[in-house]
């Protein structure tokens, strides 16, 4: 067993009272005392997450654009100015999901952020796709990344970066602001406003302390999961993986079908799937009574078929259980979940469940 890796913020987590756990081979904070309280802080104020375990890859070379247009399902040609970002799946030729990621246009090429647990697989896959392209990849382990999220996140970051306040406030969602080795992006994984900020690793702890002094609470991975689930956001390895099509995982919106001549990996398989009719779809499930919907539980849709819960939890905001599920495409507004041998009625809803701290489904 190799020892788990540590982010540049490890000592700051310990000092803040974090309970550390192994997550994708990294020692990460699961909470700092109360997962529930941390969840509520992000919904009502501002919290910060260490996401330095995720992998930042800088992409350069004359063919970087053409290579990315083959590698991912969304189209980097949409990125019209430096700092603009898009979300995409990286697909196999069979049209299943290798990983989900964000790509930013930069002055030198592109910057990609991929998941921690898939990094080695992703890099091997990307290297295998480079033949015939003038493209180079550089993994930026010299950077740390902090996500500052919540209704007061922008205000509190601006209070410690007053010289950038105007530029930060001007950022729209999925836009980034490069500042030397620092990079501020108006992105997140919580369903709240906020920033994901890349900083040189040796400046990460001092920035963490500045944020603490500005009233930004550290938040663990436990609350990160309940927040993203309320926001209806996928988690790789749970809601989609290399056995699942993006069309069956709520990722259809991330596929750029035009221009028709762009031959991205998996395109033919997805077109065939669309032509034949997609068999499964992703939905939200709501259980307003007792019980908790958990990953792996069977979903039964009368006279239609069966599906499965891919992520489930008790929602701290809604005070009842919610889940993301993959169910037969013909599923309507009602289904049942097998809770300890009892088929229990659940509502089928369109996600997200929560946006900006408020319930948004019907």
Swiss-Prot record:
The keyword Isomerase does not apply. The keyword Transferase applies. GO terms for biological process: glycine decarboxylation via glycine cleavage system. PANTHER family: AMINOMETHYLTRANSFERASE, AMINOMETHYLTRANSFERASE, MITOCHONDRIAL. HAMAP family: GcvT (MF_00259). It is an enzyme of class 2 (transferase). GO terms for molecular function: aminomethyltransferase activity; transaminase activity. It holds the Pfam family GCV_T. Belongs to the GcvT family. InterPro entries: GCS_T (IPR006223), GCS_T_bac (IPR022903), GCST_C (IPR013977), GCV_T_N (IPR006222), GcvT/YgfZ/DmdA (IPR028896), GcvT/YgfZ_C (IPR029043), TrmE/GcvT_dom1 (IPR027266). The gene is gcvT. This is Aminomethyltransferase. It comes from Chromobacterium violaceum (strain ATCC 12472 / DSM 30191 / JCM 1249 / CCUG 213 / NBRC 12614 / NCIMB 9131 / NCTC 9757 / MK). NCBIfam families: gcvT (TIGR00528), PRK00389.1 (NF001567). Its EC number is 2.1.2.10. The glycine cleavage system is composed of four proteins: P, T, L and H. It catalyses: N(6)-[(R)-S(8)-aminomethyldihydrolipoyl]-L-lysyl-[protein] + (6S)-5,6,7,8-tetrahydrofolate = N(6)-[(R)-dihydrolipoyl]-L-lysyl-[protein] + (6R)-5,10-methylene-5,6,7,8-tetrahydrofolate + NH4(+). The glycine cleavage system catalyzes the degradation of glycine. GO terms for cellular component: cytosol; glycine cleavage complex. Keywords: Aminotransferase, Transferase.
């Amino acid at each position: 067993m190799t020892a788990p890796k540590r982010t540049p913020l490890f000592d700051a987590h310990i000092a803040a009272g974090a309970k550390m756990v192994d997550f994708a081979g990294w020692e990460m904070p699961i909470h700092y005392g109360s997962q529930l309280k941390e969840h509520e802080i992000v919904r009502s104020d501002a919290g910060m997450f260490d996401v330095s375990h995720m992998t930042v890859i800088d992409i350069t070379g004359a063919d970087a654009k053409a290579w990315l247009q083959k590698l991912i399902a969304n189209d980097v040609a949409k990125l019209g100015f430096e700092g603009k970002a898009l979300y995409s799946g990286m697909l196999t030729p069979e049209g299943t999901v290798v990983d989900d990621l964000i790509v930013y246009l930069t002055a030198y090429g592109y910057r990609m952020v991929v998941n921690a647990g898939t990094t080695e697989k992703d890099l091997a896959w990307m290297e295998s796709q480079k033949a015939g392209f003038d493209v180079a990849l550089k993994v930026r382990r010299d950077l740390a990344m902090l996500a500052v999220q919540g209704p007061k996140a922008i205000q509190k970051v601006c209070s410690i970066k007053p010289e950038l306040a105007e530029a930060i406030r001007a950022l729209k969602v999925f836009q980034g602001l490069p500042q030397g080795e620092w990079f501020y992006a108006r992105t997140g994984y919580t369903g709240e406003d906020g920033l994901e900020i890349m900083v040189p690793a040796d400046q990460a702890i001092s920035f963490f302390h500045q944020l603490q002094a500005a009233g930004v609470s550290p938040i663990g991975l436990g609350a990160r999961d309940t927040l993203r689930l309320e926001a209806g956001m996928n988690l790789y390895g749970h809601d989609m993986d290399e056995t699942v099509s993006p069309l069956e995982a709520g990722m259809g919106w991330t596929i750029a079908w035009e221009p028709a001549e762009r031959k991205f990996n998996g395109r033919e398989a997805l077109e065939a799937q669309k032509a034949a009719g997609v068999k499964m779809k992703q939905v939200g499930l709501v259980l307003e009574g007792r019980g908790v919907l958990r990953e792996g539980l069977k979903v039964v849709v009368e006279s239609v078929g069966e599906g499965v819960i891919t992520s489930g939890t008790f929602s701290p905001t809604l005070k009842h259980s919610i889940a993301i599920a993959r169910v037969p495409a013909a599923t309507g507004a009602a289904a049942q979940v097998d809770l300890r041998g009892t088929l229990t009625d659940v509502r089928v809803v369109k996600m997200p469940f929560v946006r900006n701290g408020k319930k948004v489904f019907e």
